[in-house]
């Protein structure tokens, strides 16, 4: 799909501004029959601001087909506590859940486990997450926010320390803070704070080495459901992927659940890959969490 748009904002404080926005995206889904008759499906996509950045359509199809075929013969595993390696797309999902707790609206509603924790070291030194609306050519890039405030780069986590929340003018006023230029809005919606381009800063470890450091564990490629409580940080999601044995991918895994607490998960990130990958306006590398509960048989 393609879209060409123009965002313009005029407000009662005398602000006038506009900027163009283009998007192009392609998604491919593949379906295969397993030996027991179950349907296995996988997909891949590419979404960019310009055509020259879009992944080759043939490559998108090949990745979708491979991700589907690799699931054939998937099975459950016994309940255990093991390391879990998040592929980049799954790391982006985890980051999205986390940053949803770092908005001013979550703070003033009392719906975040990060309340009263600004400045606290919650994650390992490998955890650095930024929201950067000034990156050239990215989906969330914009010169001003939904209230006409000049945008800026905001470091949400730096070397494991939680730096603070993303605010628009309203939530900043409600909580006694200053706006971070993070207001988002639609044509018919009121502003609310949210991220622009989220980046989990990569490390320097190849993903193969991260997997190779696991004796027994899960390589996560699928998450299902919405089992995350932002107020408490309790995390529980349906999951699938591949079992790791002696540092190698052994077999596909399905119908399991992974669970933990978000702050404990951040404190358990012991490896961050060099493979930073973009998915829309968010980017993350491979991550490894030292231990999560994998519930299966």
Residues covered by each model-derived region:
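Active-site cores enriched in adjacent His and Asp/Glu residues with nearby glycine-rich loops
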Residues: 1-6, 81-87, 120-131, 135
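Internal alpha/beta scaffold segment
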Residues: 21-98, 102, 273
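Amphipathic alpha-helical
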Residues: 100-124
């Amino acid at each position: 799909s393609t879209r060409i748009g123009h965002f313009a904002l005029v407000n009662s404080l005398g602000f006038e501004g506009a900027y163009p926005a283009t998007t192009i995206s392609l998604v491919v889904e593949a379906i295969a029959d397993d030996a027991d008759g179950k349907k296995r499906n996988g997909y891949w996509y590419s979404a960019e601001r310009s055509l020259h950045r879009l992944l080759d359509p043939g490559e998108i199809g090949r990745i979708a087909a491979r991700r589907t075929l690799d699931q054939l013969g998937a099975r459950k595993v016994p309940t255990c506590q093991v390391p879990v390696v998040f592929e980049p797309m799954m790391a982006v999902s985890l980051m999205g859940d986390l940053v949803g707790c770092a908005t001013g609206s979550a703070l003033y509603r009392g719906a975040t486990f990060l309340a009263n924790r600004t400045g606290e070291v919650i994650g390992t030194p490998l955890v650095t997450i930024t929201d950067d609306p000034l990156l050239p050519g990215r989906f969330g890039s914009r010169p001003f926010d939904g209230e006409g405030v000049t945008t800026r780069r905001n470091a949400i986590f730096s070397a494991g320390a939680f730096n603070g929340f993303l605010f628009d003018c309203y939530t900043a006023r409600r909580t006694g803070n200053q706006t971070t230029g993070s207001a988002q809005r639609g044509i018919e919606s009121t502003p609310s704070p949210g991220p622009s381009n989220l980046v989990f800063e990569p490390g320097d470890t190849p993903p193969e080495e991260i997997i190779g450091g696991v004796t027994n564990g899960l390589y996560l490629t699928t998450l299902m459901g919405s089992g995350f409580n932002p107020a408490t940080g309790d995390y529980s999601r349906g999951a699938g992927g591949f079992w790791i044995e002696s540092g190698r991918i052994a077999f596909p895994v399905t119908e399991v659940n992974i669970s933990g607490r978000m702050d404990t998960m951040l404190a358990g990130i012991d490896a961050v890959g060099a493979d930073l990958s973009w998915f829309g306006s968010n980017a993350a590398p491979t991550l490894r969490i030292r231990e999560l509960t994998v519930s299966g048989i």
